[in-house]
Amino acid sequence: MVYVELSICFFEEDRIPAVREMILSNTEEQRLISLEKLLPMQIDDFVKIFEVMEGRPVNIRLLDPPLHEFLPSDDETIEELAKSMNIETNDIKKRILDLEEFNPMLGHRGCRVAITYPEIYQMQAKAIIEAAIKVTKEGVKVSPEIMIPLVGEVKELKNIRELVIKTVENTIKEEGLKIDYTVGTMIEIPRACLTADEIAKEADFFSFGTNDLTQMTFGYSRDDAGKFLGQYMDKGILDKDPFQVLDQKGVGKLIKMATKLSKEVNPIIKLGIC
């Protein structure tokens, strides 16, 4: 199986302008125009992936990073963006400032973006299935696994799952083809582990995101923990770096608990780690 991180595609030179226009749009109508530009690019991405994988499972995580990560910080690029969008430079700068976050890892990212801007995940789901339809017509068997990130409350997953399935089914219906697909979630928040029995009722699979789960369980920032983890290991506080070796007592126990809870209500749920 291959695991695909969609956000990487968004940073590519041919699409970052449309991504930025989409993020900085003030209305849903403007966002949809930008998303229409991105749709054929995303379809092409997935066609290539499906063709290379030749029928093997492909797990695709929908957009996860905070939106501000895609925005420019240098004046020259901001001015070019303002010109292309026909907006005052100061207005663009204000919008960029408004999108900045003090703690982005715990902020407006993952499924939270889909709750506030559902059209983004709609576009991505449509791109995945249109690509699947295209390669199916070419004789390549595909069964995409669509993964919704950062779920901590079952109602988040239920809301977005319904959105994704509706988008997918409408697209399939237009083509009159049968495409096998599944919709699941990444388990990376401790609360998701503790309520896995609820979440599993709305998921075809779980993928445990051990990096973020480790960060949120220990309360360590992966980017900053290097400043003290060496001392922790030297002094015997920790035996190993928890970002290199899975912590079995804490993080592992949460995964074990989530596995047990999920299997009790959904015996056929597929479980994995990424």
Annotate each language-model stretch with its function:
Residues 1-274:
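Conserved alpha/beta-domain cores
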